[in-house]
Amino acid sequence: MTERKREHKDRKQNKNSPKNQSKVTKFLKWFFIGILLLGITAVTVVGIYVLSIIRSSPELDVQAIQSLNQPSILYDDQGNFMDNVITREQRYVVKSEEIPDNLKKAFVAIEDERFYEHKGIDIKRIFGVIASNIKGKLSGSNTVQGASTITQQLIKNAVLTNEVSYERKIKEMYLALELEKHLSKDEILTTYLNTIPMGGYQYGVSAAAQRFFSKNVSDLNLVECAYLGGLTQAPTSYDGLSEANKENPSRYLNRTKSVLFKMHELGYISSEQYNDAINEIDTNGIKFTPNNKLSKTNFEWFTRPAITQVKQDLMDKYKYTQEEVDKLIANGGLKIYTSMDRNLQNNVQKVLDDPNNYKAITNNPNEKNEDGVYKLQASATIIDYKTGHVKALVGGRGEQPAMSHNRAYYDLKSIGSATKPLTVYGPAIDLGLGGAGSVVNDSPLSNKELSSTGYKDQPKNEYNSYRGPLTFREAIKISSNLAAIKVANEVGVSNSIAYGEKLGLVYGPHSRGISTTALGQFQNDPNNPDGGNTYTLASAFGVFGNNGVKTNAKLYTKVLDSHGNVILDTSTPEETKIFSPQASYIVYDMLKDQVESGSAKSAKFGNIPVAGKTGTTTGDKDYLFAGLTPYYSAAIWIGYDKPREMRTSSGTVTSPIFGKIMGLAHKDLQYKEVDNLVE
C-alpha cells in the first residue's frame, strides 16, 4: 500500500470515528432544537398578533345585525310620522318564511355548501383554498379563490368594512364564530339574504327580485332563484340588464347553470327539476322584467336635506366615516325629529305651485319640459331665526320626480342685490364707517374709483340714472348699485367676504371682487359652485332680528338611536356673532323702508313688521327676496335651471309670494317688534 493510499484510508476512518459521529449528532440535535424554538417563537408571535386583533374587534351586537327591519324614520315638528328614510341603497327586508327554499338552497350551494355543518368558519375549505391558490401561483394562474362562509360574509356586510387586510379577515373569522353561538342557521341565512350586495344600489334578495323580475321574492321560480344565487359573486359581471350581457348573455347563463348543477349535486333539486331548468335556459334564456323605479318620499324637499344634515352632524360628532353613517341612516332604526311644520310646508308648496303668482313674467312662465316639469322654477325657505329651526323648505315648483334637484338647499346661485345688507351696509355700519344717515353719492365712478374697484366699464343702476347724494337708508331702499360699490370699496373686499362667509355665502376663486361683494354677481363656475340659496339667505337675514347673532339653521330638533337614546340634539342653538346689536338693528330698520314704501310693498301682510331686500342678477335671470319679521326670516328665489331672461322685476314677482307664505306662517300671531331693540 502506498503512503498516499494509507493517508486516505486513515482520514476515512477518522470521519467515521465515534468522536466525529458525536459532533454530527450534536449539530443535528441543536439544529432541530433551533428550528423548533423558531417555530414556537413564530407561533407565539402570530398568536399574540392574532389575539391583539381579536381584542380590537368591535363588540358583537347581535341585535344590531338583525335590526335591518328597523328603517330610520322622520317625524314632523309635532312628532307625527313624516317619511321613512330612502337612500340610494334599495333594500326591502323580508322574513324567512317569505324566502323560497330554492333561493336559500341556491345561495348555500354556490356560496357555502357546508353551511349547515360548520360553526362559522369552514376549516376544510380554508385549507382547500390555500392549496388551490398555491397551485395557481406555481402554475402562473392569477385565479385566487376565497374561503369566506355565509356567516363571515354577513359579518363583513353588517359589522365590518370592505377593507382587504389580514386584520379584517381575522376579525371576521372571530366574529363569525361568536355569531354562530347566538343565532340559528336560518336566522343567519335570512339576515345574510337581506344584506347581501346584489349590484347597483340593490341590497338583499327582495330588492334584487324587484329590480330584475318585478316580483316579490316569494314568487321567484327555480331559474330565477339560481340566477340571483349566482349573481352575488360578481354582480356587475353577471348583471343580465347590462348592455354587454344583453349582447352576449353566455356569462350569466353559464353562471346560473353552475348554480343549478351544484344544487343538483348536493341533492337540493331532483334530476327532473335540474333538466327542466337547464332546458328552460337553453330554450328561452332568462326572462327579465326590470323595475328601476325610484321611491319618492312624502316630503321630498325637506326630507333629503334633513338626512344630509343629520349625516354630517353624526360624522362631525362621532367621527363616523361616510360608509358607516350611510349604513346607520339606512338600517340603524334612527328616529329623526325634524323641525318641519307640516301645514306650513304644504301651504308654501301650494303658493309656489300656483301659476297665478307668475303672471307678471311674460316669458311663458307655465311652459313645461318633456318630463312635465315647469321650466320656470321657484324655491323658498322659512326659519325661526331664534332657534335656527327650519319650518318650511321647498326646493321646486310643481310635481317633480324623485331625487329632483333641490334648489332651496343644494343649489348655489348669484344673489344679486340681496347681498347689500349682508356684505355692504351691514359691515360698513358694524365697522363704524357710517350709519343710516351717512351720505354716499349715486354718481358715475371716478377714474380712481374705477381703478380701485377693478371695473373697466362704468357700472350702471337698474333704473339707468343717477340720483346724486343719498343716505345709506335711501340707497338701500332704491337699491343703488353705484352707492353700494362705493360703500363696499370703503369696507374692502376681504372684509366683505369675511362677513359673507360667516353668514353662509360661498365665494369661489373667481368671485372675490367688488362686483360680487357689492352686487352679488357670483361667477358660479360649474367646477366651483358659489353664491347662496334660499336656505342660506333666510338664515343670514335672521341676524338682523337677533341682535347681530346668526343661529345655525337646523332641519331637525333631535335624533334618537334604535334604543331610544338621544344621539343628536339641537335644542341649544349654535350661535355666531356677526354684527353688533346696534348695527343689526339699524340695518333692520333700513330694510323696513323697501317694504313700507319701496319696490317690495307686496311683501307686507297684516300688521306684522316686515323688513327685506329684493335681489336681481344680471339680465333678469334670477329674482330673489329675503326678509324677516319679529318671528321668522324667509327667502324666495324664482328663475330657470338653464338661466334666461324673465322680463319683469324682482319686487313684482317675489314680494307678493313672500307676503303670502309669511302670512301663512304668522297666522294667529300677534303684533310685536324685534326683541331687545337698541334705542
Curated annotation (Swiss-Prot):
GO CC entries: outer membrane-bounded periplasmic space; plasma membrane
Extracellular side: 52-679
Keywords in alphabetical order: Antibiotic resistance, Carboxypeptidase, Cell membrane, Cell shape, Cell wall biogenesis/degradation, Glycosyltransferase, Hydrolase, Membrane, Multifunctional enzyme, Peptidoglycan synthesis, Protease, Signal-anchor, Transferase, Transmembrane, Transmembrane helix
Pathway info: Cell wall biogenesis; peptidoglycan biosynthesis
Membrane topology of this protein: Single-pass type II membrane protein
Cytoplasmic compartment residues: 1-30
Family membership noted in the UniProt record: In the N-terminal section; belongs to the glycosyltransferase 51 family.
Organism: Clostridium perfringens (strain 13 / Type A)
Catalytic reactions of this protein: [GlcNAc-(1->4)-Mur2Ac(oyl-L-Ala-gamma-D-Glu-L-Lys-D-Ala-D-Ala)](n)-di-trans,octa-cis-undecaprenyl diphosphate + beta-D-GlcNAc-(1->4)-Mur2Ac(oyl-L-Ala-gamma-D-Glu-L-Lys-D-Ala-D-Ala)-di-trans,octa-cis-undecaprenyl diphosphate = [GlcNAc-(1->4)-Mur2Ac(oyl-L-Ala-gamma-D-Glu-L-Lys-D-Ala-D-Ala)](n+1)-di-trans,octa-cis-undecaprenyl diphosphate + di-trans,octa-cis-undecaprenyl diphosphate + H(+); Preferential cleavage: (Ac)2-L-Lys-D-Ala-|-D-Ala. Also transpeptidation of peptidyl-alanyl moieties that are N-acyl substituents of D-alanine
Region named Transpeptidase: 378-663
Keyword Transferase: yes
Keyword Glycosyltransferase: yes
GO annotation (BP), single: proteolysis
Start and end residues of each stretch annotated as Disordered: 1-20
EC code: 2.4.99.28, 3.4.16.4
Basic residues compositional bias, start-end: 1-14
Classification via Gene3D superfamilies: Biosynthetic peptidoglycan transglycosylase-like (1.10.3810.10), DD-peptidase/beta-lactamase superfamily (3.40.710.10)
Protein name, as recorded: Penicillin-binding protein 1A
Positions of region (Transglycosylase): 72-244
Main location: membrane
Parts of the chain that traverse the membrane: 31-51
